[in-house]
Amino acid sequence: MQRDHTMDYKESCPSVSIPSSDEHREKKKRFTVYKVLVSVGRSEWFVFRRYAEFDKLYNTLKKQFPAMALKIPAKRIFGDNFDPDFIKQRRAGLNEFIQNLVRYPELYNHPDVRAFLQMDSPKHQSDPSEDEDERSSQKLHSTSQNINLGPSGNPHAKPTDFDFLKVIGKGSFGKVLLAKRKLDGKFYAVKVLQKKIVLNRKEQKHIMAERNVLLKNVKHPFLVGLHYSFQTTEKLYFVLDFVNGGELFFHLQRERSFPEHRARFYAAEIASALGYLHSIKIVYRDLKPENILLDSVGHVVLTDFGLCKEGIAISDTTTTFCGTPEYLAPEVIRKQPYDNTVDWWCLGAVLYEMLYGLPPFYCRDVAEMYDNILHKPLSLRPGVSLTAWSILEELLEKDRQNRLGAKEDFLEIQNHPFFESLSWADLVQKKIPPPFNPNVAGPDDIRNFDTAFTEETVPYSVCVSSDYSIVNASVLEADDAFVGFSYAPPSEDLFL
């Protein structure tokens, strides 16, 4: 007889917290949304709620459970609702309110509380018999389905909201296009993927992982951010920051290698981004010059999160064989368990390439290159400083347990003498002028993109949307494989 895991799930005591709140703007209106993290057993997900929704739940519960003496912060009639201290204080009060809800079974089993926390949504329930990859692909799955927009909710995005101007990139599943939003004339990079190709290659988990990671990127200056995601019956759309300083790969091809001070600057910004991802239990796994963009003034922006692995803490490991051959760490090639330190190996490989012009163990024959990565000693040529030699040797250490970053992760990178002349606080605030400026002419300048892409004709099919084919965050999505893909920020807060 099969065990009823759903019943186990419902009997579990949830834990909740409000890690952050965000201010949103649309049509000159400002509003605050509180991000609630819900954990039950092996499952975790985010629910986005406005103050009005907390207030409604509170008023329902206080009538039914007067002895509980529940409290939430009062509505503010006068004063600045967006004062940081006020928002911080309100968030703390709302956090205390939901903590009280999960202390007592009679409260957290109340239908309104379960609905508020989305506890009965089937996609949040996990079967202990599932393997690690299956569980992690569902973890923190579908932020968008948890946004309760109410009767005046945000209209979903759709292809006809944009003018698609140029092809600026291509990948295995589709194209990246420069697009201008008709509403306000803002420029975005829109990644358009063919569902059929994704499904045929069984890559839907990676696409959903990419979407989940993109939603968490908004807090870091060196990671590309997601504005919208939506889908039609045939395609998936990511609406992203348009970063038009060109790929690091593009500039490396033109210049062969970079001076050490320039390579150091890029390596530091890349390391900062990787350190942030590691801090939220994400391993990037695909660092390479093609995935490193420069913005309009020359700062680094990491993109393409399809190979990211979620839910990996510093002491955790995973085993999936993935990445780009030139940058694979030895433990990945050996199909051994690996951890965050694969990203530090990749940082070493990219830094080596920036300084010397080629990846450290490069060979046209992939089998021979793998053998080089596994067994060949690192070759360091003259022309760089002793601290550069040192960090390359420590990052490109074949034994992951002895690699720089193995013990204290990003902190070890920060403290290496190679970065001694650099202020990390200034770096993350973009106070250090980039050593190279791409000199873009404007927000729609595409000179730093390969003409092999930009001269292509924009496919008409990416621009087409009809009402029956659009699927968005507020309705049941047509294809179960991509449930939770769509995302749009909420449009207004009823009680600021």
From Swiss-Prot:
Known regulation of activity: Two specific sites, one in the kinase domain (Thr-320) and the other in the C-terminal regulatory region (Ser-486), need to be phosphorylated for its full activation.
Repressor listed as a keyword: no
GO biological process: intracellular signal transduction; negative regulation of extrinsic apoptotic signaling pathway in absence of ligand; protein phosphorylation; regulation of cell growth; regulation of cell migration; regulation of cell population proliferation; regulation of DNA-binding transcription factor activity
Localization annotation: Cytoplasmic vesicle; Early endosome; Recycling endosome
Main location: cytoplasm
Residues annotated as the enzyme's active site: 286
Renumbered residue ranges of the record's region Disordered: 1-21, 121-156
Comp. bias regions, Basic and acidic residues: 1-11
Reaction equations catalysed: L-seryl-[protein] + ATP = O-phospho-L-seryl-[protein] + ADP + H(+); L-threonyl-[protein] + ATP = O-phospho-L-threonyl-[protein] + ADP + H(+)
Single GO molecular function: protein serine kinase activity
PTM sites of type Phosphothreonine: 320
EC number: 2.7.11.1
Annotated positions of the Phosphoserine modification: 126, 129, 486
Gene3D superfamilies in UniProt: Phosphorylase Kinase, domain 1, Phox-like domain, Transferase(Phosphotransferase) domain 1
Known partners and oligomeric status: Interacts with GSK3B and FLII. Interacts with PDPK1 in a phosphorylation-dependent manner.
Family: Belongs to the protein kinase superfamily. AGC Ser/Thr protein kinase family.
Its job: Serine/threonine-protein kinase which is involved in the regulation of a wide variety of ion channels, membrane transporters, cell growth, proliferation, survival and migration.
Official protein name in the record: Serine/threonine-protein kinase Sgk3
Organism: Homo sapiens (Human)
